[in-house]
Regions:
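Conserved active-site motif detector
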Residues: 2-204
Length: 204
């Protein structure tokens, strides 16, 4: 998701890039660090896809909806706003997320934060991700869809990056509540306004 779907290093041939899938779970950080070492100096194309399990999406959504923490989701009613940057580059993704509807017509969405360990431009980058129920769920497809709606601003991300990783190492995830805006004639550009719903990390 986000830059993780892109190629990390320039290709020397026109061959299709190798795709690695990494599950976003308690072993995710170790796996990503191993990939970082593996990719160092590698000339061939390699793309990384992050798979967010339905069970985790369910846990986060349930914690948000019920206002109750769980073993993996340290929920609280803190509702601390965080800056979201990069939305202007994700307008098509945000439009798809809203199903071409106005952002204000969307319900509040659940979401989470994901540090981007392999980001070649900013090692402290933290992605902001929203969770929705798949529009056409089938037995062979996932119940939930995850979409990246932006990034934390650099200064804020640098302060909490390591703390988020420490939580992930304990198989705990930072829950978000996200309000969508835009998608109208008066305000065509979509926006996503995230609020952190945990007191395990200080974001203020």
């Amino acid at each position: 998701m986000g830059f993780l779907k892109k190629v990390f290093q320039a290709a020397t041939t026109a061959t299709q890039p190798e795709v690695r899938t990494v599950v976003f779970d308690q072993d995710w950080q170790d796996t990503m660090e191993m990939l970082r070492t593996e990719f160092a100096g590698k000339k061939s194309q390699t793309s990384v896809h992050i798979d967010v399990p339905d069970a985790l999406c369910e846990d986060i959504s349930t914690a948000i909806d019920s206002h109750e923490p769980s073993a993996r989701v340290p929920y609280s009613d803190s509702k601390v706003p965080i800056n979201n940057v990069g939305e202007s580059f994700r307008q098509e993704d945000l439009r798809e997320l809203c199903g071409n509807a106005a952002g204000e017509d969307m319900p509040w969405l659940s979401g989470f934060l994901m540090p981007e360990i392999l980001n070649p431009y900013d090692k402290y980058a933290v992605g902001i991700h929203a969770i929705t129920i798949s529009s056409t769920p089938e037995p062979s497809t996932k119940k939930f869809t995850v979409a990246q709606v932006g990034y934390m601003d650099k200064e804020s991300a640098k302060k909490v990056h390591k703390k988020i990783l420490n939580l992930l190492g304990k198989d705990q995830y930072v829950p978000l509540l996200i309000r969508m805006t835009g998608g109208t004639k008066e305000k065509p550009n979509y926006g996503a306004f995230p609020y952190v719903m945990t007191d395990k990390i200080k974001f203020e």
